[in-house]
Amino acid sequence: MDIGRAVRFLRKRQGWTQQQLADFSHTSKSNISNLENGNQGYSPAILEYLAKAFNCSVSQIFLLAENMDNEGNLLKDWQHMPIDVLFIQLPQEVQCQLKHLIFTLIDTKK
């Protein structure tokens, strides 16, 4: 499992540069680069900042990493992935829209 590959995957899905992710996660561009390339470990604090930047949980980042191969490709087709892995891949605005839709559907069931 390589957290760096998952971070790169998520960053690219958001259309962000390493500098943008560094700004969002309160670290330097070189730290992001080193993390993505496996040249640096990660602290709980940086994982929390990254999760906040990606609007997800730390566990979702780990789950995504577990479902990636050594080249950073997803191992399974989307129909067999855990819902968290699918959700985290979506742009943040789509995640927000889906959350709103889900909460609306739940409220109508009450």
Swiss-Prot record:
GO molecular function terms here?
Answer: DNA binding
Matching InterPro entries, A to Z?
Cro/C1-type_HTH (IPR001387), Lambda_DNA-bd_dom_sf (IPR010982)
Q: What happens when the gene is disrupted?
A: Deletion of the gene results in a 100-fold reduction in transformation.
Against CDD domains, the record matches this protein to:
HTH_XRE (cd00093)
Annotated region of DNA binding? 18-37
Sorted UniProt keywords: DNA-binding, Repressor, Transcription, Transcription regulation
Tell me where in this chain the HTH cro/C1-type domain is found.
7-61
Got any disulfides in this one, which pairs?
none
Function of this protein? Answer: Represses transcription of the PilB-specific inhibitory protein CpiA.
Q: What is this protein called?
A: Competence pilus inhibition repressor
The organism of origin for this protein: Acinetobacter baylyi (strain ATCC 33305 / BD413 / ADP1)
Q: Identify the taxonomic lineage of the organism of origin.
A: Bacteria, Pseudomonadati, Pseudomonadota, Gammaproteobacteria, Moraxellales
